[in-house]
């Protein structure tokens, strides 16, 4: 009897221990599963995706546009100056001109803002100016107009060949320059003709002098060839013979 009781008690105790161990294992397994699920959930929430990246870019663009319109509304704002004097009679308050650095060059662009964004996106006035090295506020210069007379003054311009013409004041200077150039050209041509004529005269004089010198040398040579040289003693002897004969 005692042996049977001990066997039953030990088997019951073993079964209780096994139940407790299984409960502990299941609880540990549940805790690990829940921790793994929470960790995976946190990882999935903090993971950076393309969708989040696009949303981030859109939010940055929206904030930049808000700052731009707010700065446009605050630039040049003065309560004592009316809108007509600020923007001119031909321009609207919702239009501004800027210089933007694009491809290495400053370019002028016209920025038009809607009526509901003149005072900001949400209707609030912002006095913070947009300070960016890529954008410069551009104010157009006032163009001065030169008065042009309806009836230009007529001037008479004479050319080098004696012809006269009537021209307006706008083209008189150009015609004067042309006439001066033609006059200079005529003077140069006349000077060249004089120089060429002088060269021909000198050459003719030189030719005549050369020919006269040649004639003189020929005549002298002919006279020298006809004359004969007689010694003095022969001449005296000839005279004595003539006297004796006579």
From Swiss-Prot:
Q: Which GO terms describe its cellular component?
A: nucleus
Give the compositionally biased regions (Low complexity).
168-180
Q: Which InterPro entries match?
A: COR27/28 (IPR044678)
Its Gene Ontology biological processes?
Answer: negative regulation of DNA-templated transcription; regulation of circadian rhythm; regulation of photoperiodism, flowering; response to abscisic acid; response to absence of light; response to blue light; response to cold; response to red light
Q: Where is this region: Disordered?
A: 1-39, 151-232
Its chief place of residence is nucleus
Induction data: Regulated by the circadian clock at warm growth temperatures as direct targets of CCA1, with highest levels from noon to dusk. Repressed by CCA1 at the transcription level via chromatin binding and in a temperature-dependent way. 6 hours after inoculation with the yellow strain of cucumber mosaic virus [CMV(Y)], strongly induced in resistant cultivars (cv. C24) but repressed in sensitive cultivars (cv. Columbia). Strongly induced by abscisic acid (ABA). Rapidly induced by cold, but in a circadian rhythm-dependent manner and regulated by CCA1.
The record's subcellular location field reads: Nucleus
Going by the UniProt record, its keywords in alphabetical order are:
Biological rhythms, Nucleus, Repressor, Transcription, Transcription regulation
Q: What phenotype has been reported when the gene encoding this protein is knocked out?
A: Period lengthening of various circadian output rhythms and affected central clock gene expression. Derepressed expression of circadian-regulated and cold-responsive genes. Delayed flowering under long days conditions, and slightly in short days. Increased freezing tolerance.
Q: Which domain of life is it from?
A: Eukaryota
Free-text function comment from the UniProt entry: Together with COR28, involved in central circadian clock regulation and in flowering promotion, by binding to the chromatin of clock-associated evening genes TOC1, PRR5, ELF4 and cold-responsive genes in order to repress their transcription. Negative regulator of freezing tolerance.
Q: Which PANTHER family does this entry report, sorted A to Z?
A: COLD REGULATED PROTEIN 27, COLD-REGULATED PROTEIN 27
**Protein name from the UniProt record:** Cold-regulated protein 27
- Taxonomic lineage: Eukaryota, Viridiplantae, Streptophyta, Embryophyta, Tracheophyta
């Amino acid at each position: 009897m005692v042996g049977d009781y001990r066997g039953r008690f030990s088997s019951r105790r073993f079964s209780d221990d096994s139940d407790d161990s299984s409960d502990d294992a299941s609880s540990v397994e549940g805790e690990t599963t829940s921790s793994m699920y929470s960790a995976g959930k946190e990882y999935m929430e903090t993971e950076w995706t393309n969708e989040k990246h696009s949303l981030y870019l859109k939010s940055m663009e929206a904030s930049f546009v808000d700052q731009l319109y707010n700065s446009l509304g605050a630039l040049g704002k003065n309560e004592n100056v009316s809108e007509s004097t600020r923007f001119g009679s031909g321009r609207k308050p919702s239009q501004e001109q800027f210089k933007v650095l694009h491809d290495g060059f400053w370019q002028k662009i016209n920025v038009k803002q809607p009526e509901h964004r003149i005072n900001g996106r949400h209707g609030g006035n912002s006095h913070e100016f947009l300070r960016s090295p890529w954008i410069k506020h551009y104010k157009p210069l006032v163009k001065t107009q030169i008065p042009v007379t309806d009836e230009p003054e007529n001037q008479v311009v004479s050319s080098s060949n004696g012809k006269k013409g009537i021209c307006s004041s706008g083209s008189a200077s150009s015609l004067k320059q042309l006439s001066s150039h033609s006059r200079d050209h005529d003077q140069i041509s006349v000077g060249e003709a004089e120089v060429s004529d002088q060269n021909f005269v000198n050459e003719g004089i030189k030719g005549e002098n050369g020919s006269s010198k040649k004639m003189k040398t020929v005549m002298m040579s002919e006279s020298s060839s006809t004359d004969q040289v007689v010694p003095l003693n022969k001449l005296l002897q000839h005279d004595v013979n003539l006297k004796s004969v006579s």
